[in-house]
Amino acid sequence: MARCERLRGAALRDVVGRAQGVLFDCNGVLWNGERAVPGAPELLERLAQAGKATLFVSNNSRRARPELALRFARLGFGGLRSEQLFSSALCAARLLRQRLLGPPDTQGAVFVLGGEGLRAELRAAGLRLAGDPSEDPGAAPRVRAVLVGYDEHFSFAKLSEACAHLRDPDCLLVATDRDPWHPLSDGSRTPGTGSLAAAVETASGRQALVVGKPSPYMFECITEHFSVDPGRTLMVGDRLETDILFGHRCGMTTVLTLTGVSSLEEAQAYLAAGQHDLVPHYYVESIADLMEGLED
């Protein structure tokens, strides 16, 4: 049972030593805004030198994989391959490719509530997008899925169009994630994809299929490409309701870092309430603290 224990000393060396790999969330864990968390790039280098696999799981649907890789490089995280990066946009593209692609005469289009990064990921998967300028308006395919991602230009008109498509019972409703809000550098919050997905669900009377954390579908996407033993893998994140719950659902050892969204007090409140799937096994002040576990 997870008890939210401080990870240090002999326990730290044991937990990190036994781990074959580590899954990291990104924002609030590796960086905040445009600044890397102190010691984070060095930790990833040390993990690689120790032969520990590192993979990265983000609910951010704003960036396609190549753009996300550039962000890693810009913030000082070198030596990573784009194949190590898994976003909710990438996972949504995988799911829709599985569900929609078939013979040319049966392929449908995706109506997207989201930005260009999400659209780029879908195009890279060979999917057709409703309203895409490259499509012939006279030969536009039927919309067979509505995808809700992070959309800075969400509007009543877009909501209405999404609901019109969803009146077709065979039209899928997919959301990249349910994060309700995201923190800004000034301490304020901006609505997240979860807020937009809730609006579409309420207006359409439909329930979205969610691909990002805490859905195990994201772990399924990872295991398609990497051999991961969840019993010997750490899930390190900053949000209890997504990262830590995801880790528990997938059978990993969970570590909360206190450089992001969730606080130690929130974790302890979940522990007191018996909501153990939202309680990390361990916590650290920063992921830089994990380097002690790699020392000889």
Curated annotation (Swiss-Prot):
The reaction(s) this protein catalyses: pyridoxal 5'-phosphate + H2O = pyridoxal + phosphate; pyridoxine 5'-phosphate + H2O = pyridoxine + phosphate; pyridoxamine + phosphate = pyridoxamine 5'-phosphate + H2O; O-phospho-L-seryl-[protein] + H2O = L-seryl-[protein] + phosphate
InterPro entries: HAD-like_sf, HAD-SF_hydro_IIA, HAD_sf, PGP_euk
Presence of keyword Secreted: no
Source domain of life: Eukaryota
Major enzyme class: hydrolase
GO annotations of cellular component type: cytoplasm; cytoskeleton; cytosol; lamellipodium membrane; ruffle membrane
CDD domains: HAD_Pase_UmpH-like
Subcellular location: Cytoplasm, Cytosol; Cytoplasm, Cytoskeleton; Cell projection, Ruffle membrane; Cell projection, Lamellipodium membrane
Cofactor note: Divalent metal ions. Mg(2+) is the most effective.
Swiss-Prot/TrEMBL cofactor(s): Mg(2+)
Tissue expression per record: Detected in brain (at protein level).
Catalytic residue positions: D25, N27
Binding residues for substrate: S58, N59, N60, H182, K213
Biological processes, Gene Ontology terms: positive regulation of actin filament depolymerization; protein dephosphorylation; pyridoxal phosphate catabolic process; regulation of cytokinesis; regulation of mitotic nuclear division
NCBIfam families reported for this sequence: HAD-SF-IIA (TIGR01460), PGP_euk (TIGR01452)
Function according to Swiss-Prot or TrEMBL: Functions as a pyridoxal phosphate (PLP) phosphatase, which also catalyzes the dephosphorylation of pyridoxine 5'-phosphate (PNP) and pyridoxamine 5'-phosphate (PMP), with order of substrate preference PLP > PNP > PMP and therefore plays a role in vitamin B6 metabolism. Also functions as a protein serine phosphatase that specifically dephosphorylates 'Ser-3' in proteins of the actin-depolymerizing factor (ADF)/cofilin family like CFL1 and DSTN. Thereby, regulates cofilin-dependent actin cytoskeleton reorganization, being required for normal progress through mitosis and normal cytokinesis.
Quaternary structure, from the entry: Homodimer.
Listed name of the protein: Chronophin
Classification lineage: Eukaryota, Metazoa, Chordata, Craniata, Vertebrata
